[in-house]
């Protein structure tokens, strides 16, 4: 009898199964690993403005801040002939007619650009965008707004956004060591541009911080605080310690996250002795209070992962910070192919020990349509990156839906692909919906970039805009 032997009693018993092996072998994959990209610090001396800069100067946070590029003239002075004249003129026009953020780029970030081809360089594209890169017909979506997530609407006190039931965002300061062109807080962060007069905090800084702490003491449902800005790297470390030590004394606070793009953009800041001592004091106090504390950073391109960044990350991890996590933004022309995303995630994970955490669909701020992706494109990207990274390090691609919050891109409740309108639901009320009986049953809309729509959908939005302009032109 097949696969059986017979005992002396005449009863059949199964034989031990045998398996053939050796037929499996590595297959060709859409993404190839290991990476070909080197983990190196680019030589800053290739850049004309930095040719005589010593290693000691380059690794000095004070030198980096003092020589940060603050305008296009300084950008040209740093890059010299590496910045093509036509690109200079294109960026200059963008600064006049489209930019929602001022230019502020530390030398370290300039050095991360591919100076052999600045036109196509992903870092330049989002730090110093050119006018010709913007969408020519729809630079802004008709539904775009300066505070696209309505964070200020959810301030119980100035600068503290209470959107989720148990979590808040503390906007400590309105400045960063570097300004990204796609900043979701363009209404608040940075100095004015030709297009945008920024909101200015009304309370004095210390009064604002004390009001935040007082609200948290009075609101025991909050357990999780994201300490952001701006960027915490622009908060003097002793002042940051003072705020955090008071925060740690609030019994309901169990998780704290410090948000800083400067960990990548200005790692020299985090390698200063006084900053290292301050951050070590912070994590020790958090552990004494049995509070989990982590750091969130913002890296969008694989070439931004360098040894200086890795040193700064390891210093924080060695102190006892739970994680350093990356929250990137999907930006067309920067990182919206599976190859781009996977290469970035492996560089973060393999070399810098940073956890790929989230990639956000770029928010609907003014003049950002050329960067934004459609929901279906984000869904395709999520599918394409599955299976390569460890499960715990596979980033979730999310959309931040106004009045809803983060949603995985596959959680859409309805989707009109022609008009590019997706619909989303939620299971909690924001802090401005406490008396709204329909908050948990309403469909909340989100909008794809118009250029990603079929012609019928684009025609719909052209007609919509024409009607809007008609209303604006009617006499009052």
PLM ranges: what are they?
Residues 180-182, 191, 267, 433-434:
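Short helix/loop capping segments that flank catalytic or ligand/cofactor-binding pockets
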Residues 102-105, 153-186:
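N-terminal pre-triad scaffold of radical SAM enzymes
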Residues 185-195:
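Iron-sulfur (Fe-S) cluster-binding segments and ferredoxin-like electron-carrier domains
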Residues 2-20, 26, 378-476:
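C-terminal accessory extensions appended to soluble enzyme cores
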Residues 196-204:
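Short cysteine/histidine-rich metal-coordination sites, predominantly Zn2+-binding motifs
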Residues 119-120, 126, 203-214:
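Active-site glycine-rich loop that binds ribose-phosphate moieties when present
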